[in-house]
Regions:
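Basic helix-turn-helix/winged-helix DNA-binding cores
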Residues: 1-60, 234-239
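An N-terminal domain-start capping segment
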Residues: 11-20, 25-32, 72-89, 147-162
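Short loop/turn and capping residues at structural boundaries
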Residues: 22, 35, 68, 163, ...
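Histidine- and aromatic-rich ligand-binding microenvironments
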Residues: 33-37, 58-68, 256-267
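A solvent-exposed interaction/effector surface
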Residues: 81, 98, 102-267
Length: 267
């Protein structure tokens, strides 16, 4: 009734290997004619187009098992239900990847605009932030560890960040906090909310500067002295906690280095 073709002929037409065709058969996607005398399998154009259809579904992101199942559906409605669900998954992936691209461009802009100790007034990004340590010591409760572990799952959208509390600066307390942050524009991807340990810092007018730090030197708010001098000269007052964004880190030899962008709330 139908012309038949060998597995080699079919593989050549499709640009795939004979083993791939055998794999589709094992998954129940095609049912070639089996010659019991020779033990050879022969394929028709139905098999050709069934494989093409299967590869289309695989191209939409369905797994091989999901592809096998959809090809066994008996109604268009059943097929559409599967495709509707896959459409939602593709849409979610597109949204995620668009934000990933935006994050990459944001990061590159921070790197390209890095000017050490150059002072300007800018609006800070809104960020969510959680502490990892006080100064250089990890001292977290079990609940803090759990929330921190969850926060670290948001890579690559998160960044390391130092925090200098306003009250510490006013009382000349050199302790600071280090932690992890995420910009508000990306927090919605993960439905991040404020908690006892996750704190939100809204966008606000800040004195902006950049500086580099290194592991051989203890970090203190004293690195911000150029900013404090600028504030005195321009009648600006500190109006909140100071936080930094780590633009990048590197380790050329035995020492660690950070590049910080610093946001100093002023009024």
């Amino acid at each position: 009734m139908y012309n038949t073709y060998t597995i080699g002929e079919l593989a050549k037409i499709l640009g795939i290997t004979p083993e791939t065709i055998r794999y589709y058969e094992r998954k129940g996607i095609i049912a070639p004619i089996h010659d019991e005398k020779t033990n050879y399998r022969y394929y028709t154009t139905w098999d050709l187009h069934m494989i093409i259809r299967a590869r289309c579904y695989l191209g939409f992101g369905l797994s091989i098992d999901e592809t096998s199942k959809i090809l066994q559906k008996r109604t268009l409605e059943e097929i559409d239900d599967v495709l509707d669900n896959q459409e939602k998954i593709i849409e979610q992936n597109i949204i995620y990847n668009m934000n990933l691209l935006k994050k990459m461009r944001t990061k590159r802009a921070l790197i390209n605009n890095f000017e050490e100790k150059n002072l300007t007034l800018r609006t800070s990004p809104g960020i969510y932030r959680i502490d990892t340590q006080k100064c250089y010591t990890l001292d977290l409760s079990e609940q803090e560890k759990e929330e921190l572990k969850q926060f670290t799952q948001y890579v690559p959208f998160i960044f390391s960040t130092a925090l200098f509390p306003k009250e510490h600066i006013e009382t000349e307390n050199k302790d600071f906090y280090f932690g992890i942050g995420i910009e508000e524009q990306f927090a919605s991807l993960f439905d991040i909310k404020e908690t006892e340990y996750v704190h939100y810092y809204p966008p606000r007018t800040c004195l902006y500067m950049s500086f580099s730090s290194r592991s051989s030197q203890i970090l203190t708010y004293e690195v911000l002295e150029p900013a404090f001098e600028y504030m005195k000269k321009n009648n600006l007052e500190l109006d909140g906690d100071i936080f930094t964004q780590i633009v990048s880190m590197w380790k050329p030899e035995e020492e660690y280095f950070n590049w910080h962008n610093i946001w100093i709330p002023v009024r």
